[in-house]
Amino acid sequence: MSENKNLSHNRKKDLLSKEVEHIDITKFDAREIISSMSKMSFVSRETANAADIYNEMLKDKDCTIFLTLAGSTSAAGCMHVYRDLVKYNMVDAIVATGASIIDMDFFEALGFKHYQGSQFQDDTELRENYIDRIYDTYIDEDQLQMCDRIIGEIADKLEPRSYTSREFIQEIGKYLKTNSKKKGSLIEMAYDNNVPIFCPAFTDSSAGFGLVMHQERNPKNHITIDAIREFRELTEI
């Protein structure tokens, strides 16, 4: 543990040297271990029960399946799992935090990375190196700001009116079709498969800075995010 705390000698390139790798569930069969958990206790048994319930939901053609995401799991390496759920028609809609969709998925679709770090790292040194920390995961603040600027540029090109987060994220998906550096992002996969993504707190992420910059450049003709209309769309699904 002391070694983890004593990282102040590392420079930025050293701190951002070990990428987070997203797990690929298509490369192994986890059914046996999940099934065996049904005879265990605590969270293990609940995980097996959840898998059984999910299987029943998939069999029920009248069941609408929402995938709900928290930002931390996305940064931790689960984005390909979520992408594959969309790819294989296992979800009907997604409700996520702005951090999951913009700071993690869109961020990586632009070619940027998340890096393995340490929760014991001196945050003062990280600040000096313009590195943001998500528990034990790092991202480059310069790259995050570039991501925000692109969000603003996408907004600049849209008709100035109100949009739900679903509509705006759909425009992001359209942008990625021709501009992504990393193919197969969740946003792009959802765009290709017509799976709506909702971010009820869209601006509760760095994407908010991008939209602020957009409104500063276009004080009289800018887009807005309509949370009330979005709520109605969600209830109609």
Predicted regions and their residues:
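Conserved catalytic alpha/beta core of Sir2/sirtuin-type deacylases, generalized to analogous enzyme cores
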Residues: 2-69, 74-237
